[in-house]
Design a protein with these regions (language model features):
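Hydrophobic alpha-helical segments at protein termini of multi-pass membrane proteins
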Residues: 2-200
């Protein structure tokens, strides 16, 4: 029951945080570039549907985000195992056999649930922070803040295609967070083993 409450809390918190970043991004975009000439969203640039397209794109993105958050925090149930070795645990939950560990998990899993949950959790955790970078960019442009820090910041941003440092950080961040998810799930597994031992 406690796990369900925590899962629902994390679901609502992450969805609220991401919705807030979407609203701020759209608001600051409108203030900074009402004609969307400065808009750098690669999907928008390919379609050029104006504000209707940009808002629709954000709605679709948010629906996808909700689906990922729901799977990561509510739908996914951690498998029950007796494995106390992380490699054997990963092999068991992904391939159905504790003896078939695959380094760096390059082989496609037999059980897709853990991989999907790991991906969803990582993306859901990293996206609001990456989206805030865009909000910060618009904010600094609107206020025309000019100092050494903003010069360094925008110089770094300019190094990325279309200035989309957020996409780069989202990919790197999600990759790093996948290891955090694995460690978190393994610790949960060890706690459950201990709990079952104490009950017997």
């Amino acid at each position: 029951m406690e796990r369900k409450k925590k899962g629902k809390f994390n679901f609502y918190l992450s969805c609220s945080a991401y919705l807030l970043t979407i609203i701020l991004d759209l608001l600051f975009t409108y203030i900074a570039t009402p004609n969307l000439l400065l808009e750098g969203n690669p999907l928008y640039n390919q379609t050029n549907f104006g504000w209707t397209g940009l808002i629709a794109l954000n709605v679709i993105t948010f629906i996808g985000y909700i689906a990922m958050a729901w799977y990561a925090f509510i739908k996914y149930q951690s498998p029950i195992t007796n494995e106390t070795d992380m490699k054997r645990y990963l092999a068991l939950i992904n391939y159905g056999n504790a003896d078939s560990y695959v380094p760096m998990m390059w082989k496609l899993p037999k059980n897709w649930g853990p991989q999907t949950a790991c991906l969803c959790w990582s993306v859901v955790c990293v996206l609001p922070f990456c989206r805030m970078i865009i909000v910060l960019e618009w904010f600094l442009m609107i206020l025309r803040v000019r100092n050494i820090f903003t010069e360094i910041f925008f110089t770094i941003v300019a190094c990325f295609p279309l200035g989309r440092i957020d996409i780069f950080l989202a990919v790197i961040g999600a990759w790093i967070l996948s290891f955090v998810w694995i460690k978190k799930e393994f610790k949960k597994n060890l706690k459950n083993i201990e709990k079952r031992r104490n009950q017997n």
